[in-house]
Amino acid sequence: MALLEIAKKSLLAAEKYLALNSLISVQSQPELLSQVQASQERISADSGESKSSIDGQLIAVKDNICTTDFPTTCASKLLEQYVSPFDATVVRKAKEAGAVIMGKTNMDEFGMGSHSMYSHFGPVMQSAEDGRPARSAGGSSGGSAVAVATGMCYAALGTDTGGSVRLPAAYCGIVGFKPSYGMLSRWGVVAYANSLDTLYDAINGHDDNDPTSITPQTRERIQDRLSRSRRRGQRLAIGYPEEFNLVELDDPVRDAWENTLAHLNSQSHRIAPVSLPHTKHALSAYYVLAPAEASSNLAKYDGVRYGYRDPADRSQDGLLFSPTRANFGAEVRRRIIAGAYSLSSEAIDNYFLKAQSARRIIQRDFSNAFAQPNYLITDNLEEGRGKEGVDVLIAPCSLSKAPFLEDVKMQKSALDSYVNDVLTVPASLAGIPAICLPVMHGENDPVGIQVMAQYGDEETMWEVAKIIEEGLGSGVGSKTQPTNPTVN
């Protein structure tokens, strides 16, 4: 199908599903089609060369990633009119690869939420077809997930701090990918938690502007070590973390997990239980570390340096929130207060430093589980030889399928939503790559299953993900556009 025809179908989908509120801003149709036409003419020319696999494809961008063509609001009143003077590195690289940015997607304000409900522009929802109530799109990249699932775009960029790409992907029945921390540039991404935020082919690579970006020399060293010890085309060791087998798992989720492991076993791969004993502390550690970093990162939004300024703001001493900063949503204010407390002199030892310690132990648990060592922290090839361990870990992405939006709204406490991240947060704390795939469960909606691998070993992760998708993912995803990924 010609690129122009695909783009027109995507625009029709964007119009049809407007009520789902997945988009905050959209490129004008003439400008968008003009860019696609230019790509099509370039590819159809005598040389027939495209810039990349995404040349002429429509890409949506989460609204906490800076763009010069659209406002970057972070779904907050404070930044409602803010237009960045530069493109984020991932956006610039996507444009250089020929991608057409079709718009900015809705999200939880500043990335803080699990259902994309905490937005100044209203909640995101999944399509309520056949008279059924609307379901949650997940968060915080719910707008990106819905845009892909409904065929509004070829793929979408999101950010994954504690599962904010993988959880929406699981709920919406699409693919969501979080790379190893530092592999994609975070420059131009509005930070929630610097040490946890992550945003592949066209956009992968080092960026001098991002101090957390892995250098070319380190990337080369890691890939060289991995390639020399990787089991190419051989029987893989597939682990399932015992601590993820929670009593709260819904039966369809547990069944899909078991079916995935059974399918991999039928392909002659070895299945083994793995213990990650300290991941039970992951959720509580995350909700100390992330708000602490957020309280620091959001301090600049005071109406002077960045953001909307309330005329009533007199910067009165003693106010917890000035009138300007009171324009943060309730969930953002809640996390700022929690983060500020955990960094206070009376709490930092008991909360923040202990959470940092828990994070390091969780990273060690994951590193010890894999057959390959983490070559980011070791250069010793001998360390990986003969080591017992697995090549990847397989686990669910969520405790259940997407809940009904009304049920989420009726929760007595916002804290009830935090538990939704319990299965995605561990990989974020460890900084390892993880991909969520939709796996069919009988005649029902797909269930999100994640594949996790050692730091930098995206290749093995992709290999196993392909086996799962080919065997259990047939026909999943949107009726219009099955399994295009939302990457972070």
From Swiss-Prot:
Main subcellular location of this protein, as a coarse class: mitochondrion
Superkingdom of origin organism: Eukaryota
Pfam families: Amidase (PF01425)
Catalytic activities: L-glutamyl-tRNA(Gln) + L-glutamine + ATP + H2O = L-glutaminyl-tRNA(Gln) + L-glutamate + ADP + phosphate + H(+)
GO molecular function list: ATP binding; glutaminyl-tRNA synthase (glutamine-hydrolyzing) activity
Active site: K62 (charge relay system), S140 (charge relay system), S164 (acyl-ester intermediate)
Bias (Basic and acidic residues) ranges: 218-227
GO annotation (BP), single: glutaminyl-tRNAGln biosynthesis via transamidation
Keyword annotations of the record: ATP-binding, Ligase, Mitochondrion, Nucleotide-binding, Protein biosynthesis
PROSITE patterns in the record: AMIDASES
Residue stretches spanning the membrane: none
Localization (cell): Mitochondrion
EC number: 6.3.5.7
UniProt region (Disordered), positions on chain: 205-228
Family affiliation: Belongs to the amidase family. GatA subfamily.
Assembly, per entry: Subunit of the heterotrimeric GatCAB amidotransferase (AdT) complex, composed of A, B and C subunits.
Function description: Allows the formation of correctly charged Gln-tRNA(Gln) through the transamidation of misacylated Glu-tRNA(Gln) in the mitochondria. The reaction takes place in the presence of glutamine and ATP through an activated gamma-phospho-Glu-tRNA(Gln).
Protein name per UniProt: Glutamyl-tRNA(Gln) amidotransferase subunit A, mitochondrial
